[in-house]
């Protein structure tokens, strides 16, 4: 198989004009409200699939979510795509996204957002099985090497797999946030920063767990946000108000969490870390509302 250049080094694929679209889609849209149905250009989607096939030689490509007329996924208008490869993919999902953006820039597309999942056959048979069954049973198969056998999504099991993760991770996030408030009041800003970072990660894991009925091996806060950036424009804007496409708050918390564990000097300023505690509390409220709305949707499908 030919080697795909590392386009992540040749361009910062995060630097795109996301915020105008995100602000427009967030305005007037309640938390957890389903995205408005939008028609897509089959030619545009066909070109996206062609680029994906050039890069990773997939087993199949599935369109799911609102654009497929299925259970809504992204609140932002986006191509929700699940790409399945026979073996371990030759690149990571963010590398494929960078390659796709290089070959078919968002400015050239009517729908600029692409929510891309790249999984092996082994992953969709195990860790991602409930998410895969939902996407395959309701979505549109855009490409497949072989005839696809659709199995109905068992929303009973999907619901409880999602609920278990929500209760676990949101509970842990609440504990970390409470401890962070106590550390802040005691003037231990090093510990406050560490606990706030842990709370933010648990919240993002709760959101991932509810939407995918699965765990993730991602732990860097900025990468977790990038992984789920199309789920909620309101969350995206809350965590990156500087509109840098690389959340300063999450970047700083990633650094503080590492430094608090391994460096003698880790001295965040009270004003900075106090602001992060407050914003993480708002993040908690928003993610809990998103998760409850999503769980209610699954419950209706049971």
Predicted regions, residues:
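Catalytic core of pol beta-like nucleotidyltransferases
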Residues: 2-57, 68-75, 87-186, 190-195, ...
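Short hydrophobic/aromatic beta-strand micro-patches
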Residues: 82-86
């Amino acid at each position: 198989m030919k080697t795909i250049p590392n386009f992540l080094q040749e361009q910062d694929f995060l630097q795109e004009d996301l915020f105008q679209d995100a602000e427009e889609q967030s305005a007037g849209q309640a938390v957890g409200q389903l995205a408005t149905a939008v028609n897509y250009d089959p030619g545009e989607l066909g070109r996206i699939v062609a680029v994906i096939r050039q890069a990773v030689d997939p087993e199949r490509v599935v369109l799911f979510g609102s654009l497929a007329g299925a259970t809504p996924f992204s609140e932002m208008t986006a191509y929700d795509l699940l790409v399945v490869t026979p073996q371990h993919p030759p690149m990571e999902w963010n590398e494929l996204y960078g390659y796709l953006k290089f070959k078919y820039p968002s400015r050239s597309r009517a729908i600029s957002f692409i929510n891309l999942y790249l999984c092996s056959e082994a992953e969709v048979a195990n860790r991602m099985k409930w998410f895969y069954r939902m996407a395959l049973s309701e979505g549109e198969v855009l490409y497949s090497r072989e005839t696809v056998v659709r199995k109905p999504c068992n929303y009973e099991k999907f619901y409880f797999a999602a609920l278990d993760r929500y209760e676990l991770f949101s509970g842990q996030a609440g504990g970390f946030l409470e401890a962070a408030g106590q550390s802040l009041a005691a003037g231990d800003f090093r510990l406050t920063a560490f606990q706030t970072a842990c709370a933010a990660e648990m919240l993002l894991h709760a959101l991932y767990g509810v939407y995918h009925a699965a765990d993730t091996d991602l732990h860097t806060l900025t990468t977790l946000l990038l992984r789920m950036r199309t789920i909620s424009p309101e969350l995206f804007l809350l965590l990156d108000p500087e509109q840098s496409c690389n959340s300063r708050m999450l970047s700083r918390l990633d650094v503080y969490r590492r430094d608090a564990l391994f460096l003698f000097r880790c001295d965040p300023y009270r004003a900075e870390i106090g602001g992060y505690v407050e914003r993480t509390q708002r993040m908690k409220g928003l993610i809990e509302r998103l998760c409850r709305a999503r769980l209610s949707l699954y419950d209706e499908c049971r």
